[in-house]
Amino acid sequence: MYRTFLLFVVAVAPALAQPFGFGLKAGIPLNDALAVGPGGAISYVQSTHRYVVGPFVEFRLPARFSVEIDALYRSYSYRQSLPAAQSVSTGAWEFPVLAKKGLFGGPIQPYIEGGVALSHLSVNDVLELNHRNNYGIVLGAGVTVHLGLFRISPEIRYNGWAFRGFESPVGMLESNRNQATVLVGISF
């Protein structure tokens, strides 16, 4: 038992000495979160607020590698006009876990990233709710600019989700499984 604990401490100690960062990310989607089909017996109108925001932490590792964990909030909103008027507003919490690789050293560092994400829609049961929980892949690229104690990181990110969160029975409304987002992170 003592040897196992000692081995654990020796193995974990270098990881604890690595730089740690935290901050806030905000951005806008490049494509619509919901796709609305042509009007039929049931008509939908998308009215989603176009923003993504949330905190993140980054564990900086040797050789310009890092691991980033985000908690991003994205809003969804739509109206159903027939047969009875109904508005649905909800939010999705997305939790990407990303491996990042800095491509060059210096004060301006381009990077690539990839990983997985979990998502949870916080909505009451509605007819169009297909999957409250989702998972998918995340790919991205960006640039980190060092400004004193701050790091500013604009990036473009792609999310490929496994399921559609919303999908109407008649196919007039469905959430987009492929989402692209421009984000800017400010960290310490």
Placement of each model-derived feature along the sequence:
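Sec-dependent signal peptide recognition
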Residues: 1-8
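Sec/Tat signal peptide C-region and signal peptidase I cleavage site
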Residues: 13-17
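Residues that define the transmembrane beta-barrel architecture of outer-membrane proteins
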Residues: 18, 47-51, 89-95, 131-137, ...
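Gram-negative (and chloroplast) outer-membrane scaffold detector with strong preference
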Residues: 20, 28-30, 34, 53-124, ...
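Surface-exposed strand-loop-strand hairpins of Gram-negative outer-membrane beta-barrel proteins
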Residues: 30-52, 132
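Extracellular loop and loop/strand-boundary signature of outer-membrane beta-barrel proteins
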Residues: 39-44, 81-87, 123-129, 167-172
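Predominantly the C-terminal beta-signal and adjacent terminal strand-loop region
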Residues: 64, 68-70, 75, 139, ...
